[in-house]
Amino acid sequence: MYNNDIYPALQTFGIERLRKEQERALTPILAGRDVLVRLRTGGGKSLLYQLPTLLDEPGSLTLVFSPLRALQRDQVQALERRGVHAALLNSDLSTSMHADILRDFAVNGGLLYLAPEQLRREDVRTALAAAHVRRVVV
């Protein structure tokens, strides 16, 4: 069903194989289609956008919008421990840190977690318009 690139990416997350529900959702996601996924808590929804990000061409950006800062922080820390390029962007950051993250992710891509209100900022909208945004997760 998938090319061989998916298996090393799965190993990044310590996973040998996908659940049936994840496989059903991942097929259209990898084909670049819009997908609405409804799985139970702990059902593996995050993997459905994290895994494809590892398979994207270099510089591709996945935007993850979440109003829950604790969830953003936990996911970013877990991704960083696995060597995945990820960061969160929120109002707690200094102006210079905010600008550094935007510059980095606009060029290098990865998983960027944002609170929805970040889109009110002109600097965020400008940076994202110049970036190669591959997918948006809400």
Model segments located where?
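Hydrophobic residues on the short alpha-helix immediately C-terminal to a glycine-rich phosphate/catalytic loop
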Residues: 29, 51-52, 56, 75
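Loop/turn-to-beta-strand initiation segments
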Residues: 34, 60-63, 85, 108-112, ...
